[in-house]
């Protein structure tokens, strides 16, 4: 099997350009895919259920008399949960409990409650926090079925207080993933439709005779789903358009190289475009990691995917020191950042941009993917510079509260009218002045 590992040195004159080449990734904007998604969305918007049925038959080879027949009842979800092998069910329930506990803590700590304060003249200002009414969760089907994603998308919505959670999941050839359905049961999903693709996004965004329109759509999907989510944004909210998975490992050379190699594999096995990078000041340790990669690769069931990912977008980078490693990490702004060092918190203080930070050699990224508790839906493609993990805050909205007292209207009215006249908006000014007149005449 062909495996070419790119090895860079930050001391080289051309390092900056080499790093940019490693990081270069433009999300595929295939015009044919975008046109196809647009056509499907337009069809669903006009014809509703009929369009959903036709596209589901065409793409998933599932024939149904009605969209209602594609909805799974709570009994079916419970049966999927009850049918799990006991240790698998226990693991799923334990993961769900940890994800729920973390997001309940997040709800308390992250400004998800209403607040207000009163000024001296009696004017009250504040903010009203309200959960979204209805959220749609897209869950990939077939080989890319991830029950952990059901937990990570549905549980924060439920903790936030979303009234209704609608899940869509394709079942190619009519084959259901029982673990995904069991996860939906545990996470508290209200309704599940076995539809997917752009047609499912359209059904959630616009609503059909059977599928209710939602306020926000979250969850990963293929290129057609991504194109559809881009197009319906504005009609509904979306979480993000995620790129390929990424891991960046900063290591001081004190971790077992086999552990580091497997951590790099953990993202490389997702797909050929996934990115795995190691930053380390110890050239000898980097050589040990490379040897471990080559030794362990043949034992991996997805070795072809891993090899393609590491050859195409991976890198082993020698840095001058750990300080420089942190600087480079901030520039990369990775989805997952492992700091595998003896004193990880010392270096974590220097990190400004990362979707999730995994501290210490015992904290493998895979623990965060499944059961640590924090959300595994993370910003990719350097968007961690301005974006955050999916959380409870993504399922709430904020309304400003303004209750002006009679005395407050006198003071604020003078300010507002002066500024409004300056902008040439006489009605704005007059509206404020009416309150002044009423206050002075009454």
Swiss-Prot record:
Substrate binds at residues 245, 267, 270, 336, 369, 423, 428. GO terms for cellular component: cytosol. GO terms for biological process: L-histidine biosynthetic process. Pfam families: Histidinol_dh. Gene3D superfamilies: 1.20.5.1300, Nitrogenase molybdenum iron protein domain. The keyword NAD applies. NAD(+) binds at residues 138, 199, 222. The active site is at 335 (proton acceptor), 336 (proton acceptor). One of its GO terms (molecular function) is histidinol dehydrogenase activity. Its EC number is 1.1.1.23. Keywords: Amino-acid biosynthesis, Histidine biosynthesis, Metal-binding, NAD, Oxidoreductase, Zinc. Its cofactor is Zn(2+). InterPro entries: Ald_DH/histidinol_DH (IPR016161), Histidinol_DH_CS (IPR001692), Histidinol_DH_monofunct (IPR022695), Hstdl_DH (IPR012131). Coiled coil: none annotated. Zn(2+) binds at residues 267, 270, 369, 428. It catalyses: L-histidinol + 2 NAD(+) + H2O = L-histidine + 2 NADH + 3 H(+). Pathway: Amino-acid biosynthesis; L-histidine biosynthesis; L-histidine from 5-phospho-alpha-D-ribose 1-diphosphate: step 9/9. Binds 1 zinc ion per subunit. It comes from the Bacteria. Catalyzes the sequential NAD-dependent oxidations of L-histidinol to L-histidinaldehyde and then to L-histidine. Belongs to the histidinol dehydrogenase family. This is Histidinol dehydrogenase. It comes from Ralstonia nicotianae (strain ATCC BAA-1114 / GMI1000) (Ralstonia solanacearum).
């Amino acid at each position: 099997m062909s495996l070419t590992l790119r090895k860079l040195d930050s001391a080289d004159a051309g390092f900056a350009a080499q790093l940019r080449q490693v990081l270069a990734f433009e999300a595929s904007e295939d015009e044919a895919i975008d046109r196809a998604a647009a056509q499907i969305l337009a069809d669903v918007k006009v014809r509703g259920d009929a369009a959903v049925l036709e596209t589901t038959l065409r793409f998933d080879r599932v024939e149904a008399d009605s969209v209602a027949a594609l909805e799974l009842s709570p009994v079916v979800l419970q049966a999927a949960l009850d049918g799990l092998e006991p240790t698998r069910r226990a693991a799923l329930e334990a993961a769900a409990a940890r994800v729920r506990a973390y997001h309940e803590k997040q709800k308390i700590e992250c400004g998800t409650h209403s607040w207000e304060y009163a000024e001296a003249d009696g004017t009250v200002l504040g903010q009203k926090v309200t959960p979204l009414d209805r959220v749609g969760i897209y869950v990939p089907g077939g080989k890319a079925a991830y029950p952990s994603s059901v937990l990570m998308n549905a549980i924060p919505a439920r903790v936030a207080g979303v009234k209704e959670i609608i899940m869509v999941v394709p079942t190619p050839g009519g084959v259901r993933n029982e673990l995904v359905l069991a996860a939906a049961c545990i996470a508290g999903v209200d309704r599940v439709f076995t539809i997917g693709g752009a047609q499912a996004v359209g059904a959630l965004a616009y609503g059909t005779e059977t599928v209710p329109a939602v306020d926000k759509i979250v969850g990963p999907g293929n290129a057609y789903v991504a194109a559809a989510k881009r197009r319906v944004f504005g009609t509904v909210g979306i979480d993000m358009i995620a790129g390929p998975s990424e891991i960046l490992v900063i290591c001081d050379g004190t971790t077992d190289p086999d552990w580091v190699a497997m951590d790099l594999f953990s993202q490389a096995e997702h797909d050929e475009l996934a990115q795995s990078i190691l930053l380390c000041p110890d050239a000898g340790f980097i050589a040990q990691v490379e040897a471990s990669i080559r030794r362990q690769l043949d034992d991996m069931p997805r070795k072809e995917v891993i090899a393609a990912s590491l050859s195409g977008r991976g890198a082993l980078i020698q840095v001058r020191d750990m300080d420089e490693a942190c600087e480079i990490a901030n520039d990369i702004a990775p989805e997952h950042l492992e700091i595998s060092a003896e004193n990880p918190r010392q270096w974590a203080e220097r990190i400004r941009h990362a979707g999730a930070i995994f501290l210490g050699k015992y904290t493998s990224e895979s623990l965060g993917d499944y059961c640590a508790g924090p959300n595994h839906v993370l910003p990719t493609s350097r968007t961690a510079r301005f974006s955050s993990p999916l959380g409870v805050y993504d399922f709430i909205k904020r309304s400003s509260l303004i209750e002006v007292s009679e005395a407050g209207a006198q003071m604020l009215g003078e300010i507002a009218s002066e500024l409004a006249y300056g902008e040439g908006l006489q009605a704005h000014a007059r509206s404020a002045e009416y309150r002044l007149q009423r206050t002075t005449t009454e």
